[in-house]
Structures are given as C-alpha cells and as structure tokens.
Curated annotation (Swiss-Prot):
EC number(s) on file: 2.5.1.3
Catalytic activity: 2-[(2R,5Z)-2-carboxy-4-methylthiazol-5(2H)-ylidene]ethyl phosphate + 4-amino-2-methyl-5-(diphosphooxymethyl)pyrimidine + 2 H(+) = thiamine phosphate + CO2 + diphosphate; 2-(2-carboxy-4-methylthiazol-5-yl)ethyl phosphate + 4-amino-2-methyl-5-(diphosphooxymethyl)pyrimidine + 2 H(+) = thiamine phosphate + CO2 + diphosphate; 4-methyl-5-(2-phosphooxyethyl)-thiazole + 4-amino-2-methyl-5-(diphosphooxymethyl)pyrimidine + H(+) = thiamine phosphate + diphosphate
Entries under SUPFAM superfamilies matching the protein: Thiamin phosphate synthase (SSF51391)
Gene Ontology CC terms, in alphabetical order: cytoplasm
HAMAP family found in the cross-reference section: TMP_synthase
Coiled coil: none
Family: Belongs to the thiamine-phosphate synthase family.
Binding site for Mg(2+): 70, 89
Entry function: Condenses 4-methyl-5-(beta-hydroxyethyl)thiazole monophosphate (THZ-P) and 2-methyl-4-amino-5-hydroxymethyl pyrimidine pyrophosphate (HMP-PP) to form thiamine monophosphate (TMP).
Entry protein name: Thiamine-phosphate synthase
Cofactor info, note text: Binds 1 Mg(2+) ion per subunit.
Amino acid sequence: MYQPDFPPVPFRLGLYPVVDSVVWIERLLQAGVKTLQLRIKDKCDEDVEPDVANAIKLGRRYGARLFINDYWQLAIQHQAYGVHLGQEDLETTDLSAIRNAGLRLGVSTHDDMEIDVALAARPSYIALGHVFPTQTKQMPSAPQGLEQLTRHIERLADYPTVAIGGISLERVPAVLKTGVGSVAVVSAITQAADWQVATAQLLQLAGAGDE
C-alpha cells in the first residue's frame, strides 16, 4: 500500500526530464513540462545555490513539480517541490529534515535490494533504472531491460514509479506498456536535433502527469 513517509506525488508524473541548467528548466517549463529535475553534479553548495534558487522560483511560477537532485539542504532552504536522492545519499542525508520541511522525496534504485532500501525510507516515488544502456553517466550495474522493469513495476504496483536510463523517443511506448507511471529522459531532449519537437512528441506519448 502506498503510504509514504513524505508528501505524496501523483501516481503518474508523466514526462520527467532531468537537466543540468536553469536554461533548460525554463525552456521545458515554457514547453509545458510539469515534472522535471535539476541535476547539477560535483559543485559545492555555494556555487550551485543561485541555480537551485532560480530553478525553484521558475518551477513555482509555472506550477510545476521541480525536484532538486542531491542538494537537499538548498532544496529545503528555497522550498523546492521535492528532492531526488541516489542510494549512496540516503545514509548521509537528514531524511527527517526533508520530511519536516514538507518536501517530496524520490529515490533511485537499480535492483531488488536497492528497492528494499528505498521502500524502507517510504519515499514519495521510486525511480527504476537504468532501463537501457546510457551515455549520460557512468553506471555500476548492467541495464535492466523491459522484462526486469516490468517485474519491478508489478512488485510496486501501487507506488508511483519512474523509469530512467537510455530512454529514447522510440522506446517510450514500450516503456509505458510496463505500467510505469513516469518516463525520465535526458539526452532524448537535450541532444535532440530539435528539442522543442522532441519535447512535444514526448509529452504526447508520456503526458504531463496527473494533477
């Protein structure tokens, strides 16, 4: 049963772009995206704070669900919609501070054991990846594929889920057939020949999520 220890999110978050700049955040909000994540890696809080603050302001202006990857203290300080954490961050993050601030929490997983860890934290949603090979980041595990993703979705039937990793426009229909509630994309938008066309096509397939 879906009883998160954090504020809930819609069962279907729809298209969920993960981008590394405020420029992309604003572009995608203007294009009608309602769920998105700012993922800036390997910078100190002081350097990244202006971007985090501006992204959160934009998300609020557009009524969007903006998640901040990793920088949970800044997310709390600037009142983001939510925070997304990797498995390695769960042990070093003050989850109660995120909860008490009223922020949603998303957690990455790559296998059954990590799903167990995520469920123990009772987050708002669980991300499942990486589904296909990806060049976006170095991955310690092998791609899960659609069969494994389907099995995880069956296990998490009443939990909001997000599929991520190597998902191109052409692969979205097959990914959605697994029953996953959201499709996270990176290069399918940021490396597209025409990002506006790609975003519109992805929104048509995956939707903007439930209200």
